[in-house]
Amino acid sequence: MLGVCYYPEHWPEERWEEDFKAMRALGLRYVRLGEFAWSALEPTPGALRWGWLDRVLDLAQKEGLAVVLGTPTATPPKWLVDRYPEILPVDREGRRRNFGGRRHYCFSSPAYREETARIVALLAERYGRHPAVVGFQVDNEFGCHGTVRCYCPNCREAFRGWLRAKYGTIDALNAAWGTVFWSQTYRDFGEVELPHLTVAEANPSHLLDYYRFASDQVRAYNRFQVDLLRDNAPGRFITHNFMGFFTDLDPFALAEDLDFAAWDSYPLGFTDLMPLPQEEKVQWARTGHPDVAAFHHDLYRGVGRGRFWVMEQQPGPVNWAPHNPSPAPGMVRLWTWEAIAHGAEVVSYFRWRQAPFAQEQMQAGFNRPDFQPEVAFFEVQRVAEELSALPLPPAGCAPVALVYDSEAAWVFEIQPQGAEWKYLTLVFSFYSVFRRLGLEVDIFKPGAELGGYGLVVVPSLPIVRKEALEALSQADGLVIVGPRSGSKTEKFQIPPEIPPGALQALLPLKVVRVESLPPGLLEEAEGPWGRFAFGVWREWVETDLPPLLRFTDGGGILFRRGRYLYLAAWPSPELLFALCQSLAEEAGLHPRFLPEGLRLRRRGPLVFAFNYGPEVVEAPAPPGVRFLLGDRRIPPHDLAVWEET
């Protein structure tokens, strides 16, 4: 199904009914609204103006639209900030952030918790049983604009309490953090400060605990709202819209309190921000990288335990990337179908009409500010017609499982040991290779059940907890583990048995030395798939296992014991492709090399093919299959769907 984000408070009331009628005529079923409307609902303290929202919801019901109502807590009004200035967050440089944007609150603020409880309870009590309201979105894009980690006095006190609960005694904390180093020993939890503004780098264990604490604070704030909504809005779903390429919080943990996950898909903006070579950014400037949206669909399907929405889908140029090109004709339709192929229950577009004012006036919508339709309007009209004629089977399991860990991103942010080491870059490289091989990927948190997958990929897992080791030991298929896995304990220390730590139960080897390589300094390796150049990262390994791939100086780079493999370097694109292709063939997954820009996705017996490229491509469909959308020749920025039994 399809939906759209709408802001009735931005438009004259006489437009509302006309807009809702146009939404239904377009084929939209859902409308999200209200997530930034606190000042419109309560312009002065206690003076609640529900009337306009009452009328909006009644009109939506009349026109057959289902409403996802946002809690308005991402934008506390000016009067609230003036009354409680301490709710404003403090940045890493110790500066109090000002009113005038959005997300201007601290998750640890007691005053803001109280005000949140008041407005959310009032909203849920009034609309939790309204027939138009089918669900709630909690807040909006937790952590956007760098707001997960705050450095205010409230956070300091909350962090001290978090540490007391975790460690019990200050001696336990000192041992865990190794505070004997640089004379950092604490006598009491009340002496612990937030890890910022230090002369030299802060203690990495201190930083990691603070990152964990900050993520936990967001989760607690979300759960706090969820509980209020559950109490007052029976039978309504609750979700939150996560972001792309964002690791400051743990989405798997937060989503445990939601009915499903949602995310905001802006393929062009994300591609412009990705650490890609400039030629690739130009190549995909109007389409988005072929794997950027798919990666997040699969990630948030995993986060949502099999269920996800796209709450905001890009319909035109955005306003927040360094460069903001317009999508190529056909791409809004392609992105929509791709989300559906990956299992999205709803694709909702941002926004119905481009705002003529304020910060997002340069961000396109379905309609221009003069009320005339934009290009995306007609592409979505076509999708709605196609959807009505194409029954969709349930999405099944993929053949490849990938283990994703936000904590790993935190570890490498704190201690990268090399400027080019980026966790998400490594993860995305693995994911993208399997997409180029025509294979689907399911994404899991560490410790999730991995049975039934022919191939399990762990790009890097520095902290290997007991449940993660158990899940890997019980996996049915081949398991490939990437560099720096098992390199730290939960306390952010080198494990006593040295890396890969607990993974030595599966892979009897020791990483005895590591190095990071600057750009241009390359090592060469050779093996059964050819000769490859390596950069970024290398490890020296002691083991009795024979290496499958060697550096030219004799050091091993790839080791195997039974079903388990360890990769002791940052893989070059060429090696990664050859390795993953070989493992997929061994696992019986039938990989195939797709033309550049072509991607496949199965949904039950349906096979979707998406052409991100500028040329016509041939659909890799068996002879005689029936095409349900398109045909064997797929034009640029188009798709085809066929059925395979």
From Swiss-Prot:
Entry's EC annotation: 3.2.1.23
Protein name: Beta-galactosidase BgaA
Pfam families, sorted: Glyco_hydro_42, Glyco_hydro_42C, Glyco_hydro_42M
Temperature sensitivity of activity: Optimum temperature is 70 degrees Celsius with ONPG as substrate. Stable for several months at 4 or -20 degrees Celsius in the presence of 10% glycerol. Activity increases continuously from 30 to 90 degrees Celsius and drops dramatically at higher temperatures. Retains 50% of its initial activity after 1 hour incubation at 70 degrees Celsius. Retains 90% and 50% of activity after 30 minutes of incubation at 70 and 80 degrees Celsius, respectively. The residual activity of the enzyme decreases to an undetectable level after heating for 30 minutes at 90 degrees Celsius.
Active-site residues, record numbering mapped to chain: 141 (proton donor), 312 (nucleophile)
PANTHER family (alphabetical): BETA-GALACTOSIDASE GANA, BETA-GALACTOSIDASE YESZ
Gene name linked to the record: bgaA
Keywords: Glycosidase, Hydrolase, Metal-binding, Zinc
Enzyme class, first EC level, given as a word: hydrolase
Family membership noted in the UniProt record: Belongs to the glycosyl hydrolase 42 family.
High-level lineage: Bacteria, Thermotogati, Deinococcota, Deinococci, Thermales
